[in-house]
């Protein structure tokens, strides 16, 4: 098996950084400079749906947006059955610094990722795994970049998901409610839902829903229960698509009323509650454009308390 350096001879001092679900991640320094690059090595042979390294590569190569991680170079090792994705090294991961960055930076991150999602929607691309680990920062002041398209999907590059989409997408308590009910025909609404959760947690510094991960026992049923106890028990009258989800009728849920957002996010400004309430909702989730149009007023309001 050829070494990582064989495929990226313009990098030196290549060292292992971390491991992902289907990848090994290395970091190296460009020769004759101090600039760092990340090398993500993903297998092509042993797929773990919805992970698809080649599809992710093709989607990323088709994207050109200032707040979406850009591929600098890529290589395929046919002998080992691996794909190499080279990107610029970013100093911070949002999940590591959420409680340290300023209100102003948080507002900028929301607007920058909203712009990225607006771009993805325009081009028919679903990210399907938005959470703080997949938001990278150049510095503690940003800018922010949406990263990791390993389970992304697009109409142009559907991979094996041609007839129907896989519902097992997302990470932990960020999973969209329709995927928990086995929906195979979801759209951009899944990214809007997860983005809403990210915004809520960015400004509250606490998890919006509970899937049991904090106790070491993550559960789809526990996450579903947490969502329903928070947003109220859905029904086909308020959410017509619900009756089409394969797993909706497999359970009988207690009838919970929806909690007011002032109770769900008591420590968060009402302007943030308003934005989140239009994203983390069963039906008619707001578009990224709504967030972009609304957030300048939010930023101005929050700056008074900064």
UniProtKB/Swiss-Prot annotation:
InterPro entries: CDK (IPR050108), Kinase-like_dom_sf (IPR011009), Prot_kinase_dom (IPR000719). One of its GO terms (biological process) is regulation of gene expression. Acts as a CAK-activating kinase that specifically activates crk1 of the crk1-mcs2 CAK complex. ATP binds at residues 17-25, 40. One of its GO terms (cellular component) is cyclin-dependent protein kinase holoenzyme complex. Belongs to the protein kinase superfamily. CMGC Ser/Thr protein kinase family. CDC2/CDKX subfamily. Its EC number is 2.7.11.22. This is Serine/threonine-protein kinase csk1. It is an enzyme of class 2 (transferase). GO terms for molecular function: ATP binding; cyclin binding; cyclin-dependent protein kinase activating kinase activity; cyclin-dependent protein serine/threonine kinase activity; protein kinase activity; protein serine kinase activity; protein serine/threonine kinase activity. Keywords: ATP-binding, Kinase, Nucleotide-binding, Serine/threonine-protein kinase, Transferase. The active site is at 129 (proton acceptor). It catalyses: L-seryl-[protein] + ATP = O-phospho-L-seryl-[protein] + ADP + H(+); L-threonyl-[protein] + ATP = O-phospho-L-threonyl-[protein] + ADP + H(+). Residues 11-306 form the Protein kinase domain.
């Amino acid at each position: 098996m050829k070494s990582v350096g064989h495929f990226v001879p313009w990098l030196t001092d290549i060292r292992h950084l971390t491991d992902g679900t289907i990848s090994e991640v290395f970091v190296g320094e460009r020769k004759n400079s101090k600039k760092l690059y990340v090398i993500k090595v993903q297998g092509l042979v042993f797929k773990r749906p919805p992970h698809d390294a080649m599809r992710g590569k093709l989607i990323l190569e088709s994207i050109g947006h200032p707040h979406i991680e850009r591929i600098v170079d890529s290589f395929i090792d046919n002998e080992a059955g691996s794909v190499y994705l080279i990107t610029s090294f970013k100093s911070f991961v949002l999940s590591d610094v959420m409680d340290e960055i300023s209100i102003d930076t948080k507002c900028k991150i929301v607007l920058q990722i909203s712009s990225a999602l607006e771009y993805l929607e325009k081009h028919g691309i679903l990210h399907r795994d938005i959470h703080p680990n997949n938001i990278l920062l150049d510095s503690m002041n940003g800018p922010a970049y949406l990263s990791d398209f390993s389970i992304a999907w697009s109409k142009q590059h559907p991979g094996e998901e041609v007839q129907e989409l896989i519902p097992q997408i997302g990470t932990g308590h960020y999973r969209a409610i329709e995927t928990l009910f086995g929906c195979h025909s979801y759209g951009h609404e899944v990214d809007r839902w997860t983005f809403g959760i990210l915004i809520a947690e960015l400004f509250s510094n606490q998890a919006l829903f509970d899937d049991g991960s904090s106790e070491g026992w993550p559960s789809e049923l526990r996450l579903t229960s947490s969502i329903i106890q928070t947003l109220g028990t859905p029904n086909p009258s308020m959410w017509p698509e619900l009756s089409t989800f394969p797993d909706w009728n497999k359970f009988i849920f207690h009838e919970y009323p929806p909690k007011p957002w002032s109770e769900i996010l008591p420590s968060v400004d009402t302007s943030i509650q308003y934005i989140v309430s239009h994203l983390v909702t069963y039906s008619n989730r707001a578009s990224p454009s709504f967030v972009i149009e609304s957030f300048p007023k939010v930023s101005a309001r929050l700056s008074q308390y900064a």
